[in-house]
Amino acid sequence: MNGTEGLNFYVPFSNKTGVVRSPFEYPQYYLAEPWQFSVLAAYMFLLIVLGFPINFLTLYVTVQHKKLRTPLNYILLNLAVANLFMVFGGFTTTLYTSLHAYFVFGPTGCNLEGFFATLGGEIALWSLVVLAIERYVVVCKPMSNFRFGENHAIMGLALTWIMAMACAAPPLVGWSRYIPEGMQCSCGIDYYTLSPEVNNESFVIYMFVVHFTIPLVIIFFCYGQLVFTVKEAAAQQQESATTQKAEKEVTRMVIIMVVAFLICWVPYASVAFYIFTHQGSDFGPIFMTIPSFFAKSSSIYNPVIYIMMNKQFRNCMLTTLCCGRNPLGDDEASTTASKTETSQVAPA
């Protein structure tokens, strides 16, 4: 084995020279240079500085403006809440531990940090699934008279939390476990060992199938159908400038959604899957740390893509920040007209 396994940790470094120490008790400078831990801390600080204001502002602006309290925006708010879970439950902890170069909070703190980071990430992921389904049902109209209402939004919210808990909670009760990963300053699911005493192999397979592959398939299917529907509508109305504009907006939005999802999650999932299927292989701590950077950055991507590109929300945000006046001069009528104009084919 090219790593060192302990009671509640796995360090990706051979202990042939006897230098490996518990990541809960000693700095891990044999894994990476001090400046690399400083870079990790600086990155976490950047995510906190950017992630907290934009997600908090999302919640605050929605509370301030009643017209934003629509069923679809419930899901967008759920994204903001999930991102705040990641900011406070994961990023702040990783910032502090990176400054010390080891996980100073012990196994209990590791369980809590791993749980909240996983919970926030999964809530965000399943929120994107609900958004994809909502867009598919509203735009493609597989059910002709269906209208996405408040009850459907509440059911969607419940689904995101149930599925997130179904992924984040089992390691706390003996099915798999949370251990320090990468540079040993943050915690995640144990992809590194089979750990038969906690049935780790079955949990990792379950997580990859139910909490990664299935969401990915749903998102691609829904947005693929969305693009086809919009193109078909445009083909039938060649002279409709409104439809042509909506086609471009939806296509751009879909591309950004899919690319952001892939950038955020596929590198991390791919590396984790490789590590799990190549037990004992030789890899360094940076091998897992860098992909996790992209996954954590979803706390910034999500509000920018799903909310900041919404013209109505953007106008409300500017009005809130500028004490009741919109410096861009976009009046309510133009915002309403724009929203109505693309309501049948463009994202809300």
Swiss-Prot record:
- Renumbered to this chain, motif 'Ionic lock' involved in activated form stabilization spans 134-136
GO MF term list: 11-cis retinal binding; G protein-coupled photoreceptor activity; metal ion binding
Which PROSITE patterns does this one have? Answer: G_PROTEIN_RECEP_F1_1 (PS00237), G_PROTEIN_RECEP_F1_2 (PS50262), OPSIN (PS00238)
Specify which residues bind Zn(2+) according to the UniProt entry for this protein: E201, Q279
Database matches in Pfam families: 7tm_1, Rhodopsin_N
Source organism, top-level taxon: Eukaryota
**Residues the record lists as N6-(retinylidene)lysine modifications:** K296
- Processing after translation: Phosphorylated on some or all of the serine and threonine residues present in the C-terminal region.
Q: Which family does it belong to?
A: Belongs to the G-protein coupled receptor 1 family. Opsin subfamily.
Q: How does it assemble?
A: Homodimer. May form a complex composed of RHO, GRK1 and RCVRN in a Ca(2+)-dependent manner; RCVRN prevents the interaction between GRK1 and RHO. Interacts with GRK1. Interacts (phosphorylated form) with SAG. Interacts with GNAT1. Interacts with GNAT3. SAG and G-proteins compete for a common binding site. Interacts with PRCD; the interaction promotes PRCD stability. Forms a complex with ASAP1 and ARF4. Forms a complex with ASAP1, RAB11A, Rabin8/RAB3IP, ARF4 and RAB11FIP3; the complex regulates Golgi-to-cilia rhodopsin/RHO transport in photoreceptors.
Query: What is the recorded function of this protein according to its Swiss-Prot or TrEMBL entry?
Result: Photoreceptor required for image-forming vision at low light intensity. Required for photoreceptor cell viability after birth. Light-induced isomerization of 11-cis to all-trans retinal triggers a conformational change that activates signaling via G-proteins. Subsequent receptor phosphorylation mediates displacement of the bound G-protein alpha subunit by the arrestin SAG and terminates signaling.
Q: Any idea what this protein is called? A: Rhodopsin
